[in-house]
Every structure is written in C-alpha cells, then in structure tokens.
C-alpha cells in the first residue's frame, strides 16, 4: 500500500490507521512525490482536507474544511481515511481509529478536560470506538483511578529484569536468551544485577523516595536457580526500604521452571504475588507456539504454589493463538476460574515483527479476527459474571482483531505495578538488561528515560556504563528542586 502525504505532518497516525485495515502489507510512506501509483491513499491539506483512496476497482474521495487548530485537522484527516477504509473493507474496528497503546490514559485525560459525558461522546462519535469497548474502558478507568490515587509525589516502583527463558515462544519478540544458549552468562549476570540493585537502592535512599511496588519480569525470572533467585531477591530486600511497599510480584510465567525450592525462595524474600502463565490448556496449542511444557505441568505448578502459601496468583491466557478455537479458549478460561485464580489476564495475539510466527510467514486474516473477538467477548462476559473487575488495559499494533490486553482480578487483588507502569503514574527505576528507567516529574507529565543495554552479554561487558548512567537519576531529581 502506498501512502502519499501532501502539505501536512499527519503521516504517523495515517500509517498506523492504514495498518489496522492492511496488517499484512508493507506500507510505503511518501512525503515528496510527483505522481501516485495504485494502490494508494493520498491525504492532502490545501484549501480543504482531502483524502483519496484507490484500491483495484475501488475509488473514493472525501473532504473536510480546514480549521486553525492543527490537532483538529489531523483528527479530521484520520476520520476521513477511516470512513473510506471502513466502506472499502466492511470492517468495524472495535477501537475505531484509535491506534495508541494507552486508550485508558487518553480517556482519563479527556475526562479531566471536558467531563465524563463529553469524553464518552468523543470516543463514540469522533474516534468511532464501539459501545462495548467504551464500556470496558469506563470500567477499567474507574478501577485504575483508585490505584493511581494511592501514589504520592515521592513514590516509585522498582523493575528487575531477568532476560532468560527455557525456550522462545513463537509469538514472543522480547529480547531474552534461552537457557541452553546462555547458561554460562546466568551467574555473572546475577552477580552484576545485584550490584546494580545495591547502587539503585542507595540512590533511592539518598533521594528520600518511597518504594510502592516491586516487579520481577523478563524473560522468565524463575529460570534462575533457587540460589540465584535468593541472591537477587535478597539484594532487593537488603538495598531498599520495603516498609511502605504495597506489592512484590515475580513472573514465574513458565510452569516448567517452577519448583518447590524456587517458590520457597520467593516466599522467604517477601514475594506476595506471582504469575503462572499457561497461555492455553491445550497441549496441541502449546506445542504449536513453542511452549515446551504441557497443560498438566501448569496445573501441577499452580497446585504447588498454593501449597507453598501463595494466595495471589495471576494466570495469562492468549486469544487468537494458532491451532486454538473459540471452544478451546473457553475451556482454558473456565479452567482458570475452576482454579479460583485471583487474577486472569487475557492477552490478544500480537504479530510482532521479531516474533518467529511473523518471520515464518503467518498472517492475520478476517476469520482469525472474528474468532479472537469471540474469545475476548466470552472472557469479558464470563469474568464479569464471576465478579472479576478489569483494572489494566493496553493495546499493541498488529493485534489479531484490533483488540486489547486486559487484566481481570477479584477485588483487592489488582496488580498495582501494572497500572503504575502503563499510566506512567510515578518513577520506575529499572535494573537489569533491557530495563528502561522512567523518571517522572510529579508536578507534570514530563518523563525522562535512562536505558540499560538490551542483551545480557552487553550488560555484562559494559556494566561500568550502566552504573555511570545512574547519575542521571540524581541529576533529574536535583533539577526538579533547583
């Protein structure tokens, strides 16, 4: 698909919107051109806004008046393109023309500016969001708001990254290393990670920051040995003041990494919340996506975690997986409810460019989108009926069916960290490879980022640079108070 932009700077939103309707096609963006070539979209801003589309035998053009507000001109242009592509495809996008990661944050911002009624009307009439998704957004925003209000100006959360997994799932694009390839890196990485944690803890103490939540992600943190887990968790406990900490989560995502010894190491180090993620309870689906464990291993790991005293367990499912069906997804969700999991997170398959599913030529089609929407609809209806509440929602590009990821929990079991990181409520200090520290000015929306190296071998080989970058944290807070 060729996207031609004339006399405007709206190419980013127009490209993202085009990708909603043509997820498998390369989109070529031209801002300087002499002529256009089919199939094309032409968006121009002259005496009026004009959007023209020509795809095969289909041709259409729509116009709108130009106004003084460039933001409104951009919205008008995107709306015109959405209307034409909707007419061409017959597809009702659940989130309309919204393509951003954080629709709940947008809704909250609009409510603060123009009120609830006007912001809901904006979602429905200007953004073409479906009534069903607006209701979901309304519920999520209300539940998020209660969590956000717990944060103080001096609050922060800690993220610790463990970039190792037993194997790579076919839908995954995260930077991580499989155990068989990276075993020799694990102990050196662990030792240096503890050093970074200690340095970060000292900075937080010097600045008088208040630790609200701790989150171990990855990768799969429980890929580490019990001794290594104890080493890293112990570094957190000895380096930070956890007296005000409301939540300590560890992703124990892969059932094939979970043992009693590791669970005891978590318990001994004040971890109160874990995730054990089946993705599906169909062995055929698990095999198709490269998960080298069985459904029974998940059930065994969940039971073991209960026996070890964990009473706040999240489970992840993915709608739209290869080989899965609507009935298969229903069985998976019903199994999570039968286990009485405190939290069920329903992801939608995202075809990321770095994932092997995408590299192997897997494409999105309308039938798969319809199936994924049926799965997500069943999850929302069933979880709501069982008194689970949506408290965390985000979206990604190239999601099957243009859907969303939603965490549902029993009341009182929401993950605070998930809300804080997605809303960008307060500072997140990150340790480990791939970590991104986000420093937030509590009096504004201003964010400053400090990046760690992505790969474990880089992290180990250039660790001195990681420590030097920590000075940016103190500099940020000193500048706030100068």
Give short role names for the model-derived ranges.
Residues 161, 275, 344-348, 419, ...:
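Beta-strand scaffold of nucleotide-dependent catalytic cores
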Residues 51-53, 160, 276:
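Short beta-strand motif preference
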Residues 27-37, 354-431:
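A C-terminal junction/extension of Radical SAM enzymes
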Residues 209-210, 214-218, 228, 399-405, ...:
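Amphipathic, soluble alpha/beta structural segments
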Residues 1-116, 126, 147, 193, ...:
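Radical SAM enzyme core and accessory elements
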Residues 155-190:
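Canonical Radical SAM [4Fe-4S] cluster-binding loop centered on the CxxxCxxC motif
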């Amino acid at each position: 698909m060729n996207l031609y932009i004339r006399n405007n700077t709206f190419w980013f939103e127009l490209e993202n919107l085009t990708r909603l309707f043509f997820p498998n096609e390369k989109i070529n963006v031209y801002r300087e051109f002499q002529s256009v070539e089919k199939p094309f979209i032409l968006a121009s801003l002259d005496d009026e806004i004009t959007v023209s589309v020509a795809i095969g035998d289909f041709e259409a053009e729509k116009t709108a008046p130009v106004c003084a507000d460039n933001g409104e001109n951009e919205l008008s242009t995107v709306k015109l393109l959405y209307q034409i592509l909707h007419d061409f495809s017959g597809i009702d996008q659940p989130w309309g023309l919204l393509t951003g990661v954080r629709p709940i944050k947008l809704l909250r911002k609009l409510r603060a500016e123009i009120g609830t009624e006007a912001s809901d009307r904006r979602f429905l009439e200007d953004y073409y969001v479906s009534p069903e998704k607006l209701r979901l957004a309304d519920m999520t925003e209300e539940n998020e708001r209660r969590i956000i209000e717990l944060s103080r100006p001096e609050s922060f959360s800690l993220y610790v990254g463990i970039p190792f997994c037993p194997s790579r799932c076919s839908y995954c694009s995260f930077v991580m290393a499989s155990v068989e390839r990276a075993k020799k890196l694990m102990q050196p990485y662990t030792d240096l990670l503890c050093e970074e944690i200690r340095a970060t803890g000292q900075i937080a103490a010097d600045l008088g920051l208040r630790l609200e939540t701790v989150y171990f992600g990855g990768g799969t943190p429980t890929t580490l040995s019990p001794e290594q887990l104890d080493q890293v968790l112990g570094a957190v406990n000895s380096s930070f003041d956890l007296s005000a900490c409301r939540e300590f989560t560890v992703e124990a995502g892969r059932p094939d990494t979970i043992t009693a010894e590791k669970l005891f190491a978590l318990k001994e180090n004040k971890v109160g919340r874990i995730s054990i993620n089946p993705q599906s309870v169909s062995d055929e689906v698990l095999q198709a996506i490269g998960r080298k464990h069985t459904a029974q291993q998940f059930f065994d790991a969940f039971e073991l975690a209960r026996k070890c005293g964990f009473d706040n367990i999240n489970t992840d499912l993915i709608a739209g997986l290869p080989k899965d069906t609507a009935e298969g997804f229903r069985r998976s969700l019903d199994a999570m409810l039968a286990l009485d999991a405190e939290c069920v997170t329903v992801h939608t398959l995202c075809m990321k460019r770095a994932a092997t599913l995408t590299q192997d030529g897997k494409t999105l089609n309308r039938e798969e989108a319809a199936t994924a929407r049926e799965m997500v609809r069943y999850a929302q209806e069933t979880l709501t009926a069982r008194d689970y509440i949506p408290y965390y929602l985000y979206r990604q590009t190239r999601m099957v069916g243009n859907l969303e990821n939603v965490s549902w929990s029993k009341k009182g079991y929401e993950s605070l960290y998930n809300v804080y990181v997605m809303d960008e409520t307060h500072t997140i200090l990150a340790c480990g490879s791939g970590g991104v520290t986000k420093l937030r000015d509590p009096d504004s929306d201003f964010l400053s980022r400090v990046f760690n190296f992505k790969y474990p071998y880089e992290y180990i080989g250039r660790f001195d640079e990681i420590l030097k970058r920590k000075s940016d944290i103190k500099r940020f807070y000193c500048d706030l108070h100068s």
